[in-house]
């Protein structure tokens, strides 16, 4: 028999002040799956005046966390940040292929906002002055060239849509995961790179509250002016995109494999990859199965 860790629902006092609703549980299958169920039942915050309402779904432990394409999502109770955020945006924006790829980038950029803002508040500094945070397109968070976490963005339809859809932004970050419990040799944890930091429970609340604030600000601007904000997001991503100029091997959902150099981040949040034959392949966020 496998003994389950005794866990408690996370205390998110700061986050409760920043968000419209917080649903915190001791142990569930996954915050993302729970968020989908809340959406199906219409049990999440909405804002009738056109603002961005945010519902936070958190748990002390998850028994079946899943990321993109149903892949297992590593989460160590008491050491990981793993929270889902529910928002509503106009369906016209969420279904517009010219701009909707940027929603995944917004999740990553908001996560960087939250982490970097929290480190500033704590007075935390990196052990290595060259240590920095980047985003690996389309959904990974990198620290000093190693995977610190990832995001998962998914659109869901509430029962009464009224021209809007719900979007789930799930964010996972290794905060204090010991080296021997990291999921891969290419993974890392925040405490391995910066100090001082508060206890992990407090750190989770600080990051979550800042993530709510950043998501609200970024999404409000995005839904008001999608094309203008897409251009601004593209410029911002160029500064933090870990993949620009690098060689990649991408396994696509359709079964193909593309290998080559990332040469551009495009207006619709896709990337262009130049293969060994000199041809350029355009890849969207929805094309990717696995990328190394």
For each feature predicted by the language model, list its residue ranges.
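Residue-level signal for inorganic ion chemistry
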Residues: 31, 83-85, 111, 140, ...
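Short, acidic (Asp/Glu-rich) active-site segment that either coordinates a divalent metal cofactor
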Residues: 160-194
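Acidic (Asp/Glu) carboxylate-rich active-site/surface patches
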Residues: 103, 107-162, 172
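Short beta-strand segments
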Residues: 58-60, 84, 136, 152-154, ...
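N-terminal lobe of the biotin/lipoate ligase/transferase fold
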Residues: 1-120, 124-131, 201, 244, ...
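Conserved, helical-rich catalytic subdomain that frames metal- and/or nucleotide-binding sites
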Residues: 195-255
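Conserved RNA-binding domains used in RNP assembly and mRNA/RNA metabolism
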Residues: 244-292
């Amino acid at each position: 028999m496998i003994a389950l860790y005794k866990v408690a629902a996370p205390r998110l006092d700061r986050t409760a002040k920043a968000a419209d609703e917080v649903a915190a549980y001791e142990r569930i299958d996954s915050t993302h799956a729970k968020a989908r169920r809340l959406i199906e039942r219409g049990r999440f915050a909405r804002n009738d005046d056109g603002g961005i309402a945010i519902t936070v779904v958190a748990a002390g432990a998850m028994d079946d966390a899943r990321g993109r394409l149903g892949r297992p999502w590593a989460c160590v109770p008491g050491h990981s940040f793993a929270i889902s955020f529910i928002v509503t945006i106009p369906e016209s924006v969420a279904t517009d292929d010219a701009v909707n790829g940027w929603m995944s980038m917004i999740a990553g950029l908001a996560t960087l906002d939250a982490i970097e803002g929290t480190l500033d508040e704590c007075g935390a500094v990196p052990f290595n002055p060259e240590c920095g945070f980047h985003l690996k397109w389309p959904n990974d968070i990198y620290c000093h060239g190693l995977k610190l976490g990832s995001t998962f963005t998914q659109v869901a339809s509430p029962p009464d849509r009224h021209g809007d859809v719900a979007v789930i932004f799930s964010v996972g970050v290794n905060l204090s995961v010991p080296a021997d419990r990291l999921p891969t040799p290419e993974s890392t944890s925040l405490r391995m790179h910066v100090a001082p930091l508060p206890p992990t429970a407090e750190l989770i609340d600080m990051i979550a509250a800042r993530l709510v604030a950043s998501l609200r600000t970024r999404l409000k601007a995005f839904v008001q002016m999608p094309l203008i904000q897409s251009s601004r997001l593209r410029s911002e991503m160029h500064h933090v995109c870990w993949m620009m100029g690098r060689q990649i091997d991408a396994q696509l959902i359709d079964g193909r494999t593309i290998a080559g150099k990332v040469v551009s981040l495009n207006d619709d949040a896709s990337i262009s990859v130049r293969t060994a034959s000199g041809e350029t392949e355009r890849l969207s966020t929805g094309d990717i199965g696995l990328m190394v």
